[in-house]
Each structure stands twice: as C-alpha cells, then as structure tokens.
C-alpha cells in the first residue's frame, strides 16, 4: 500500500526529511555526475531528489503512482508531475535515459509488471537507481519515516529481482 504523497511531502519538509533528502541526493549525484542532455524520470515520490537536474538535463519529469496521489512540482515553475498506474507507464519505449525509483518499489502490489514497464521505457544504455528500505536497516523497523512502510529489501533480493527483470545490477549502496 502506497503512502499518500501529501504525507511524504510533510516528511521531507521536516528536519529529518531535509537531512534525508541531502544524503540521498549526494549519493545520486555521485552515481550520476553528468546528466547534460539527458531525459530523467523520477518514479514514485522522487521529487525531493530531482531539483539538481533541472539546470542540466534536457527534460526532468516525475511520475507519481495513482495509488499514491500527486503533488505539484516544482513549486516555483511549471508542473512536471504525471500521475499514472504503476504498471502502465505513459512513456514511449526506450525514451528515458535515467530513472530513479523512490517510495514505490516497496509499496506496489504490481512489482513485476512495474519492473517490466521500467525496462520498456528505459533506453538500452539507460541507468536506474532504486531507493528502498534496507531489510537490515534501522529505518525499516520504525514507522516514524516513510522508509518504515512497505516491503524492505536485502541486497541479494534486489539483485535477484533486477536480474529476473533483465536488468544488470552494477552498484549497491
């Protein structure tokens, strides 16, 4: 079951949420240091992590699952959020260069169809980052943060899911 987008926005407006956003953004930027000319999609509730790409990528969008609801983003510009079913993504085949999944994979009831759709829209040389609660992590054991909801994953579970979905797993952080 998805966490409501309004509740996620409230979390990321708190002190803990702001620290979380900074730490995750830093990791993402380490992996994706150059996104000039690329099309980037944030899937789930990924908007807290997309702002740095607005000035360099050709296109930055956010897709929020209908079950999660949506919020306007960015607050200081034209809306870049699309709402869709998580297993029927409204994008052409091979149209996304970089895709980040946050607050979605652990909540969906359609995991394998969702991964199949991500595979379909991601370019052959595209890159995917998945942010999920760690099965061994402290945050997966408390419901004080959004990372305490849904299905946590171990590294081996993620590797197996991605391999079964025809993805090549390169990095675990």
Regions found by a protein language model. Give the residues of each.
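Class I SAM-dependent methyltransferase Rossmann-like catalytic core
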Residues: 1-33
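Short glycine-enriched, charge-decorated loop/helix-capping segments at active-site entrances
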Residues: 14, 77-78, 144-148
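Class I SAM-dependent methyltransferase SAM/SAH-binding core
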Residues: 34-88
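A short acidic, Gly/Pro-enriched loop at the edge of an enzyme's catalytic core
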Residues: 87-99
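A short SAM/SAH-binding and catalytic strip from SAM-dependent methyltransferases
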Residues: 97-110
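A short glycine-rich, Lys/Arg-flanked "PGG" loop and its adjoining helix->strand segment in the class I
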Residues: 112-127
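Short, glycine-/aromatic-enriched active-site segment of Class I SAM-dependent methyltransferases
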Residues: 132-150
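Conserved small/polar residues in nucleotide/adenosyl-binding loops
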Residues: 171-173
């Amino acid at each position: 079951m998805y966490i409501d987008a309004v509740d996620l926005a409230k979390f990321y407006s708190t002190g803990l949420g702001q620290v979380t956003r900074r730490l995750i953004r830093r990791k993402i930027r380490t992996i994706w240091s150059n996104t000039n000319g690329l099309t980037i999609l944030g899937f789930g509730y990924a908007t807290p992590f997309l702002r740095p790409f607005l000035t360099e990528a050709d296109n930055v969008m956010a897709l929020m699952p209908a079950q999660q609801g949506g919020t306007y983003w960015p607050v200081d510009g034209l809306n870049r959020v699309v709402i869709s079913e998580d297993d029927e993504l409204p994008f052409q085949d091979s149209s996304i260069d970089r895709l980040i999944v946050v607050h979605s994979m652990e909540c969906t009831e359609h995991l394998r169809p969702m991964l199949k759709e991500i595979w379909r829209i991601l370019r052959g040389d595209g890159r995917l980052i998945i942010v999920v609660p760690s099965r061994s992590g402290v945050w997966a054991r408390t419901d004080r943060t959004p990372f305490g909801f849904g299905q946590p994953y171990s590294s081996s579970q993620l590797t197996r899911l991605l391999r079964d979905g025809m993805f090549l797993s390169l990095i675990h952080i």
